[in-house]
Amino acid sequence: MFCVQCEQTIRTPAGNGCSYAQGMCGKTAETSDLQDLLIAALQGLSAWAVKAREYGIINHDVDNFAPRAFFSTLTNVNFDSPRIVGYAREAIALREALKAQCLSVDANAHCDNPMADLQLVSDDLGDLQRQAAEFTPNKDKAAIGENILGLRLLCLYGLKGAAAYMEHAHVLGQYDNDIYAQYHKIMAWLGTWPADMNALLECAMEIGQMNFKVMSILDAGETTKYGHPTPTQVNVKATEGKCILISGHDLKDLYNLLEQTEGTGVNVYTHGEMLPAHGYPELRKFKHLVGNYGSGWQNQQVEFARFPGPIVMTSNCIIDPTVGSYDDRIWTRSIVGWPGVSHLEGDDFGPVIAQAQQMAGFPYSEIPHIITVGFGRQTLLGAADTLIDLVSREKLRHIFLVGGCDGARGERNYFTDFATSVPDDCLILTLACGKYRFNKLEFGDIEGLPRLVDAGQCNDAYSAIILAVTLAEKLGCGVNDLPLSLVLSWFEQKAIVILLTLLSLGVKNIVTGPTAPGFFTPDLLAILNEKFGLRSVTTVEEDMKQLLSA
């Protein structure tokens, strides 16, 4: 086992990465190794997808499957080894079908990619784990060095984050052939184990640019189906009655659950990254969507144990449900998996609803605590002139985007302290689950404009980017000249691709933490600092002083 893709990876003087019987996320060595094997199979599939496009062949089954299966290897998504192997078998079957399509056009069609003809050696998980050793990401580290390995992983993990957003967009009916062609090209190239530093740096920027397009179609999918988010008050306390909790990012799953629970007497609560759903008109119209429950994903083993109803996980992040003994009432959807946990194959939430009706639910309603979400793209753009006016009248000094992933490290208190230290004449824009570090605190307003503005999920970084570009255009300056600073927390691969997106768009002087990714070497950090001004957090006082004086 070797895995260094998330922020909580093991770090020692001898090197970084989880390499024992179990990773810090709870992933076993078996599952981790089989995920490496799956990635190799997916690289072979993408190699043939690239070849097929040369013949004018576009196989939508391949396009739909490939990012979804890659998403299953993202941190805290799928811990179920047999399902990972199932994805690998499906990848190979699709590859062979695509290969046959190519051969039907050109009898001499061939693919030089080293992953193009990969076959699984056995049905036995032990045999497959041994085969997976051929594809351990750091197997040639001694030959290529830490810097090349780090850049490879930056590209692989960044592309994995983009694949997750591609799957979210696909679920909402969005498709862009250019994006899929670019995805397959990059995935296939990574299967050649590239070792050219400049080419890898260029690839990282290409992934960032591609992901901007992915976030654009995801935004289109969400707003077309569910309307544009508008500021909405959300109760974060319990309401009397039977209940279901839904977590993750998949708004379609939430919509289906709300439709199927309507009139049943079962209330629905959002959790984690599902919180922004309350801002969408077509979702909040359901009166039994009563509120948001819990805090950051890392606290779920305590909070889920206390929730008196079933829980549905639609995407990341799931962690061991046996710790809180709620594994008999947690359900996984789509690419999510945990051994022994019930999995919903289709869109029928009937079994979950039946379980909710058999459980006690909340015995009484707590005193409400209201927070505001729903500052989506249209709302943000509608406030652009107000922001410019406040800046021109020196009522608004600076905007801080403080957001990103949450996690368990104590150092993440930095982001709470930073938010509460922001001066009263400054505004905080936030998104993703890092907001749970401070989103239930009171920040007041500036002439009626809330000082804390929740822009949505991690992918809603797209809205923040569009706002920044709009402000720059109206002020006749560049984005980097705005009174705007980005202070970002990271944990997993979606955050990595958001960072690559920002860098590829030329955004500079981003401050990130609580630690640097384990696959970033000192040399890579120096390169990113020199090219983009990217740096790690220090202390709240020093960072605040530097950002306000920039």
From Swiss-Prot:
Q: Which Pfam families does the record match to this protein? A: Prismane
- One of this protein's GO BP terms? response to hydrogen peroxide
Q: What is its main location?
A: cytoplasm
Q: What's the top EC group for this one?
A: oxidoreductase
Q: Which domain of life is it from?
A: Bacteria
The protein's location, in the record's own words, is: Cytoplasm
An annotated Gene Ontology molecular function: metal ion binding
Residues reported to bind hybrid [4Fe-2O-2S] cluster: H249, E273, C317, C405, C433, C458, E492, K494
- What keywords tag this UniProt record? 2Fe-2S, Cytoplasm, Iron, Iron-sulfur, Metal-binding, Oxidoreductase
**Record's GO cellular component terms:** cytoplasm
Cofactor binding remark? Binds 1 [2Fe-2S] cluster.
Gene3D superfamilies tied to this protein: 1.20.1270.20, 3.40.50.2030
Which amino acids does the record list as binding [2Fe-2S] cluster? Answer: C3, C6, C18, C25
Q: What is its EC number?
A: 1.7.99.1
The Swiss-Prot or TrEMBL record lists the needed cofactor(s) as: [2Fe-2S] cluster; hybrid [4Fe-2O-2S] cluster
Residues with Cysteine persulfide modification: C405
Q: Which transformation does this protein catalyse, written as a reaction?
A: A + NH4(+) + H2O = hydroxylamine + AH2 + H(+)
Role this protein plays: Catalyzes the reduction of hydroxylamine to form NH(3) and H(2)O.
Q: Which family does it belong to?
A: Belongs to the HCP family.
Q: What is this protein called?
A: Hydroxylamine reductase
Organism equals Salmonella typhimurium (strain LT2 / SGSC1412 / ATCC 700720)
Q: What is the lineage of its organism?
A: Bacteria, Pseudomonadati, Pseudomonadota, Gammaproteobacteria, Enterobacterales
